[in-house]
């Protein structure tokens, strides 16, 4: 948390001289920070800070509009980013410009009431930003470490409650103390032309707030991201693509064979074997007939009995699919084979290896002695295989989309955490130094470090665009006024 109590000129107050009067820390004298900038420097400062404020406002408005108009961006994680963009927008509109006025003028020209309101707004918004980052980090951590239980509770309503809690808690922590401390202690000790938090005038107290508001959250977020990264790498290793040689050796195929019909004169029927390979959701027919008795014609299937399919995808090559007669309500966990059904059982195995998915289906023939009604044809199993192939293809596509989405989220989180740490660390290091040496940090360095905290709000929208192609395309559509397909841009 950046802190206005540690302004660079405050450390020099004991030695300032105005009108041949040596001043100490006396509350009855109005002390104002010296203005050491030349006119050219003031113009440069105003231009740079004004440009940063404009870019911050435009960038965060783009983020908010993108999430609003593009359905692809309306996810729980992006709602957290929406909250963060709101905080950054407030900083761009108010905090940046008021602090620029303070720097250029060399003193606070707007009075005590505006000063306290600015400080309260600045601290509440900054604390809300940190808490939003913590929420994003914890949310991603639970998504990775508890993928089976946490997503069920990860609803839009829950996200809204967490965001509201972050803002309300930030307001309770800072606003009352900043606005009413002078009434609690009975007097205002902040000089008329200065603006800082009265109860943080002690450098040791300032450092304590920096520990609680910056260093501790940074440690927590870093630890969480390390766990997120390790869990993601573990997933990659688990689904690492095999070599070509291994894939050839482990090729899964789909075999189905109709049972041999037993008739009255014990003459065997022709057994037909159809081999179909299912790779990446595509079926390739390779029929081959093996005739056991010549002169016999293949038996056609005439029954129109329908069946329902219950499928559970697994790895480790474990068959988990069965076909049950229509109308049966057995649980897939306890399947039951109907002896009068045309098909006794279908086994399906889907093996996911990195970006390649291989599906194998096996139709187990009916038991010996089954009636003529239980024979299988060539065409019906092939149609079923294609249906399963379509399901497998759809599942692979969904997995790839989910993996790409997770990669975007993780990359975005890393970018905004890195930007937060890089921009907020210099100032908070100076706060640490100022605790032990009040005159060691030059005025200009203080101002630059303090402004870097604000620059974080400028960088965040760029992080979203660089790490998420959907954000980038939506930004482009909004800036170029191309609204036709903006709602579904990917």
Swiss-Prot record:
Membrane-side (Cytoplasmic) residue stretches: 65-78, 139-158, 227-412, 468-490
Intracellular or extracellular location(s): Cell membrane; Postsynaptic cell membrane
GO CC terms in record: plasma membrane; postsynaptic membrane
Compositional bias ranges of the Basic residues kind: 236-250
CDD domains: 7tmA_mAChR_M4 (cd15298)
Pfam families: 7tm_1
Region (Disordered): 236-343
Matching Gene3D superfamilies: Rhodopsin 7-helix transmembrane proteins (1.20.1070.10)
Annotated InterPro entries: GPCR_Rhodpsn, GPCR_Rhodpsn_7TM, Musac_Ach_M4_rcpt, Musac_Ach_rcpt
PROSITE patterns, sorted: G_PROTEIN_RECEP_F1_1, G_PROTEIN_RECEP_F1_2
Glycan attachment residues as annotated in the record: 3, 15, 20, 25
Annotated membrane topology: Multi-pass membrane protein
Keywords: Cell membrane, Disulfide bond, G-protein coupled receptor, Glycoprotein, Membrane, Phosphoprotein, Postsynaptic cell membrane, Receptor, Synapse, Transducer, Transmembrane, Transmembrane helix
UniProt-listed GO biological process terms: adenylate cyclase-activating adrenergic receptor signaling pathway; negative regulation of adenylate cyclase activity; phosphatidylinositol metabolic process; positive regulation of MAPK cascade; regulation of locomotion
Compositionally biased region (Basic and acidic residues): 270-285
Extracellular side: 1-42, 100-116, 182-203, 434-447
Listed GO MF terms: G protein-coupled acetylcholine receptor activity; G protein-coupled receptor activity
Amino acid composition bias (Polar residues), ranges on this chain: 287-296, 304-314
Disulfide bonds: 115-195
Tissue expr: Expressed in heart and brain.
Transmembrane segments: 43-64, 79-99, 117-138, 159-181, 204-226, 413-433, 448-467
Function statement: The muscarinic acetylcholine receptor mediates various cellular responses, including inhibition of adenylate cyclase, breakdown of phosphoinositides and modulation of potassium channels through the action of G proteins. Primary transducing effect is inhibition of adenylate cyclase. May couple to multiple functional responses in cell lines.
UniProt similarity note: Belongs to the G-protein coupled receptor 1 family. Muscarinic acetylcholine receptor subfamily. CHRM4 sub-subfamily.
Protein name: Muscarinic acetylcholine receptor M4
Organism: Gallus gallus (Chicken)
Annotated gene: CHRM4
